[in-house]
């Protein structure tokens, strides 16, 4: 089984390009073994990380994602007090 995750980010305007470059690099790191496919989409002032991964790797890969987020949080605007710096959506991929 595979999981599809879409994570929304809203970089501060002065960090937009730097954040996109950093996210692109992070997604392509070799230790992200569970990733089957990935994309970065931009729309208006938001950046979307779209990742397909093996369900068995979801938990460990999510931990790496949180660690990464902690290094770039200063580049991001908060959406609100609940979601903070990301709006994530993950579910089972129907193939």
Segments and roles (model prediction):
Residues 9-21:
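Short, surface-exposed ligand-recognition loops at beta-strand->loop->(often short) alpha-helix junctions
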Residues 40-45:
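A short beta-turn/loop motif at secondary-structure boundaries
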Residues 17-19, 50, 60-61, 94:
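Short acidic, gly/pro-rich beta-turn/loop elements at beta-sheet edges
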Residues 25-37, 53-87:
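An amphipathic, aromatic/His-enriched active-site/gating alpha helix that lines ligand/cofactor pockets
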Residues 11-13, 54-56, 91:
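Non-catalytic surface loops within mature trypsin-like serine protease
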Residues 87-95:
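Short, low-order "capping/linker" segments at domain edges
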């Amino acid at each position: 089984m595979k999981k599809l995750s879409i994570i929304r980010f809203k970089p501060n305007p002065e960090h937009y390009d730097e954040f996109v470059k950093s996210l692109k690099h992070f997604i392509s790191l070799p230790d992200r073994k569970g990733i089957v496919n990935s994309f970065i989409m931009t729309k208006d002032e938001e950046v979307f990380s779209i990742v397909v991964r093996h369900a068995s790797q979801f938990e460990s890969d999510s931990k790496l994602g949180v660690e990464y987020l902690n290094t770039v949080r200063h580049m991001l605007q908060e959406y609100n007090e609940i979601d903070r710096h990301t709006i994530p959506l993950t579910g089972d991929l129907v193939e």
